[in-house]
Amino acid sequence: MAILVLGGAGYIGSHTVYELIDAGREVVVADNLQTGFRAAVHPKAKFYQLDIRDKGALDTLFQAEHIEGVIHFAASSQVGESMSDPLKYYDNNLHGTMVLLKSMVEHGVDKIVFSSTAATYGEPERVPILEDDKTVPTNCYGQTKLAMEHMMGWVSKAHGLRYVALRYFNACGAHPSGAIGEAHNPETHLIPIILQVPLGQREAVSIFGDDYPTKDGTCIRDYIHVTDLAQAHILALDYLLNGGDNNVFNLGNGVGFTVKEVVDVARAVTGHPIPAKTAPRRAGDPAQLIASSEKAIQVLGWKPKYNDLNTIVASAWAWYKSHPHGFEEG
């Protein structure tokens, strides 16, 4: 029996595939390669190039493979883009998940671990955020992810699907082997953007807003190493395979850093001055997001290994020095 990883050529998906295969699991990857990279897929994984909105392609996969569980990363995930092009997010995230769940139900696959987001909370009423805190998304991306959670809940009631939704905070870092790391085109995540400056690919870092109600006026986020995140997905899947009920877990380190603090850490790690300039706020950005992951630690037995931002940034820097253009040559 195999694990199907949808979006397994993307950043978090590819790291999860590596962790699964290192643990001796059989893995099937499906990705449309619109934002993922074929080179990021572990060579021992079976690969299908398909879009989850293509039900015929999904049906063919489920008929051909013996799938015992699904890990679902296939979604659009840029906050800013979701505000300017919300229909893309409803199409890819909601419609795509609807097609996937329909195919799973028809083929008797009833376990799914789902990549949700801290953006489901919106502007939190308290930090650290707990799983039962209010979910009032401030951007379309978070709204579609929350709707995906609700969709799984109703499909569970109707068809017996069992699911775990993992609400991530800021994934970062690279695989310890150096084989894979973070690569987006164009790049949208803070740490890779910062590291483009010492690579000579960017003159300065833009800090979007310095007037938030935080200690230095810049947004606070909770950063989590991508391999810790990958391990949490495997633990969540095993929780379902061992009879666990539907559940939602936060994943983070429980410690927040401002944008300016992340820039300072990157300066220390790289030895580069890394100029920064202030830009207007981005629509939909909450002032701070910090997770309580106590529930995942207690229920799943999750033990993050990388809780030091310097170590996380150093792993990302090692990847970018050896792969300055990501998975693309030139």
Regions found by a protein language model. Give the residues of each.
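Oxidoreductase cofactor-interface core, primarily capturing Rossmann-like NAD(P)-dependent enzymes
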Residues: 161, 177, 206-207
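Short-chain dehydrogenase/reductase
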Residues: 90, 138-146, 180, 184-192, ...
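N-terminal Rossmann-like NAD(P)+-binding domain of SDR-like oxidoreductases, especially those catalyzing
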Residues: 1-174
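C-terminal substrate-binding subdomain of Rossmann-fold SDR/epimerase-dehydratase oxidoreductases
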Residues: 193-330
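Residue-level signature of the cytosolic catalytic core of signaling kinases
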Residues: 50, 54, 183-187, 255, ...
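Hydrophobic, Gly/Ser/Ala-rich alpha-helical and linker tracts in large acyl-processing enzymes
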Residues: 176-187, 196-197, 203
